[in-house]
Amino acid sequence: MADPTRARKLADRIKVIVADALEKRVKDPRLGFVTITDARVTNDLQHATLFYTVFGSDEEKQGTALALESAKGVLRSEVGKRTGIRLTPTLTFTLDEVPETATQIQDLLKQAAEQDARVAALAAAAQPAGDPDPYKKPVDHTDDWDEDDEDDRDGDDAVDALDAAADVPRL
């Protein structure tokens, strides 16, 4: 087991070496516009996985994958020469899905922003349901009392007691 820091440094070095070798040494016509995006090395330094992206159509991506597989031996020998380590790791090439995923996430965020704008436009024109002032206020009974209400008192003691409890003024 190697130190994780050493494995990370070796992965970075392999990434640079392979990118340089693809640019200068590999002359396969199937090789499209390739970018090595990341490299990872196992802790025992025996296997290296290189992630790459290809600018182009699906056919160009397949052609590039075949070209990388056929150039794997040349690239591995170049890594062995330029790193100077005892055992050269095997190389595995994996198409990087991050750019496509990032594009999908960006599209989803754009849709969410459009929906937020529509909701904000609806909210700006919305009016609250019910009364403009929904809070209860104390009832003022003094305005309700007039001379016509004098005949309401018919001697019913229960009603008179309720009126007295409610602080209804008597004239």
UniProtKB/Swiss-Prot annotation:
Its main location: cytoplasm. Residues 120-132, 161-171 have a biased composition (Low complexity). Residues 120-171 are annotated as: Disordered. Signal peptide: none annotated. It is found in: Cytoplasm. Keywords: Cytoplasm, Ribosome biogenesis. One of its GO terms (molecular function) is ribosomal small subunit binding. It holds the Pfam family RBFA. GO terms for biological process: maturation of SSU-rRNA. SUPFAM superfamilies: Ribosome-binding factor A, RbfA. NCBIfam families: rbfA. One of several proteins that assist in the late maturation steps of the functional core of the 30S ribosomal subunit. Associates with free 30S ribosomal subunits (but not with 30S subunits that are part of 70S ribosomes or polysomes). Required for efficient processing of 16S rRNA. May interact with the 5'-terminal helix region of 16S rRNA. Monomer. Binds 30S ribosomal subunits, but not 50S ribosomal subunits or 70S ribosomes. This is Ribosome-binding factor A. The lineage of its organism: Bacteria, Bacillati, Actinomycetota, Actinomycetes, Kineosporiales. The gene is rbfA.
